[in-house]
């Protein structure tokens, strides 16, 4: 089972937040908390709060055991950008974009769940490509 927590419009660029997200994916929650506490990045603070929220969601709402939980997925997508102007030389100006992120952390208690999801995705891709190849073969037959 998967439990998750979301946080929208966090004032940090998604590129910087993804660096910290990559550190904790696949780790047990205790290890992930230690990594985030010792990471000197602004995103680590936001992800720590979000991880604690996801842990409480998993234990209270879904009845999962805290000992088995691990970080199934951590995503930092782009949120809305604020555009500001900054004065430049000779009376001109340029635009500053202050980016924000939408953060999502998913926790799971089943270690095989990630493998199952990957195999399902691979099967879907195979079906789609096989269907595409069959359509191309039909088009070639019609042309001949």
Curated annotation (Swiss-Prot):
Write the protein's name: Large ribosomal subunit protein uL22
Q: What GO molecular function terms would the record report?
A: rRNA binding; structural constituent of ribosome
Q: Ranges of Basic residues compositional bias?
A: 125-144
User: Origin organism of this chain?
Assistant: Mycoplasma genitalium (strain ATCC 33530 / DSM 19775 / NCTC 10195 / G37) (Mycoplasmoides genitalium)
PANTHER family recorded for this chain? Answer: CHLOROPLAST 50S RIBOSOMAL PROTEIN L22-RELATED, LARGE RIBOSOMAL SUBUNIT PROTEIN UL22M
In Gene Ontology terms, what is a biological process of this protein?
A: translation
The gene coding this protein: rplV
Question: Which keywords does the record carry?
Answer: Ribonucleoprotein, Ribosomal protein, RNA-binding, rRNA-binding
Task: List the residue ranges of the region (Disordered).
Answer: 123-144
